[in-house]
Swiss-Prot record:
UniProt superkingdom: Bacteria
Main location: cytoplasm
Example GO molecular function: ATP binding
Name under which the protein is recorded: DNA replication and repair protein RecF
Alphabetical keyword list: ATP-binding, Cytoplasm, DNA damage, DNA repair, DNA replication, DNA-binding, Nucleotide-binding, SOS response
Pfam families the UniProt entry points to: SMC_N (PF02463)
Role of this protein: The RecF protein is involved in DNA metabolism; it is required for DNA replication and normal SOS inducibility. RecF binds preferentially to single-stranded, linear DNA. It also seems to bind ATP.
Cystine connections: none
Amino acid sequence: MILKRISILNYKNLEQVELNFSAKLNCFFGQNGMGKTNLLDAVYFLSFCKSAGNPIDSQNIRHEQDFFVIQGFYEAMDGTPEEIYCGMKRRSKKQFKRNKKEYSRLSDHIGFIPLVMVSPADSELIAGGSDERRRFMDVVISQYDKEYLDALIRYNKALVQRNTLLKSEQPIEEELFLVWEEMMAQAGEVVFRKREAFISEFIPIFQSFYSYISQDKEQVGLTYESHARNASLLEVLKESRVRDKIMGYSLRGIHKDELNMLLGDFPIKREGSQGQNKTYLVALKLAQFDFLKRTGSTVPLLLLDDIFDKLDASRVEQIVKLVAGDNFGQIFITDTNREHLDRILYKVGSDYKMFRVESGAINEMEEKER
C-alpha cells in the first residue's frame, strides 16, 4: 500500500496540510516541537483509527478549533485507489470511512493499511509495565489475524464484566461468574496460542536484525510467559476467584502475560546501555515490519521518528544501509539532524521527497534547496 497524498485540518498543531508523497522515501526536517511527529501521527491514525500518542480523540483537535479531519489517498499493490477519511467533532463520535462508506466497527479497518512506527515512545516497551509489551504483540498480530483481534475484544469485554462482579459487595452466584470465566477462557486460549506462535516465528527475525545493526556485538532474546501455559485457563480463573474477590480485580489470565526482553541471559531493562536499548527497539520494530510483510498481502508503511538518537556512528550507518535498501517499501522519516537524512538520500538516489517543518507548516523543498 502506498500513501499518495494526505490532507489534514486542525490535527494537533497542524492547521492545514496538503502533501503529495514519494512512493519510496519521504523525509521531514525541522527542530523539535514543530510538527514532524504530529504528521507521522496523522498517518498512523489512518491505519489504527487512533493516535499513537494520545488515545483521547478530542484532545488531538487543534486548540480553539471544533474538529479535525484527516484524509489519506492510497494506491493498493494492484493499482486500485483507496480513500480513507477520519473526522472528529468535539462532543461527537468520530467518523471513519473507506471510499466514503462508514465503518460499522472500527476493528474491521485494522490491518487494511498495515503500518509500523519506530518512535522515542518505544522506550516504554523496555522501561514500562507488561501492558506495553502485550500491546506490542497485539498491534502486530491484529494487523494480519482477524480471529486474534476478535478473540482479544471478547476476552477484554468478559474481563470487564468479571471485574465488576468481583467488586460487588452483594453475594454473586457461582453460575454468573462461570458465564464470564468460560468466555474469558475460550477467547483467552485463542489469544495465547496465537501469541505463542507469533513469538516463536518472530524471535529469529528479530535476532537477525539486531545482529546486523550491532555487527554481532551482543546476543538478544525474547521469552513469553502466560498463565495459560501448562494449565486450563478456566481452572486458573476458578482457582483464583477467592483471592480476586479480596483484591477486587482479576489477578490471573492472559491480560497478565509477559514478554521478557533479554540482553544475553538478563533483562535488558536492567543490563542495557542507552545505545543497546535503542538498538533493541529499532531491531524489534524492523523485525515487526519484516514479519508483517511476510504474513500479509501488502507491504506495510514504515514511519521512523527520530530513529538515530542515542546511537553511535557504526549503528547509525548499519540502519542507514537497511533503510536505503529495497526491503521496506514506502518510508516516512523525521530528524532534526539534516546530515542523517542526507546520508540516506545519498544511498537511495532520486526517488525521494524532502519536507521542511516549521511551526505546524509543512512544505516540500525545491530541488535547489535540498
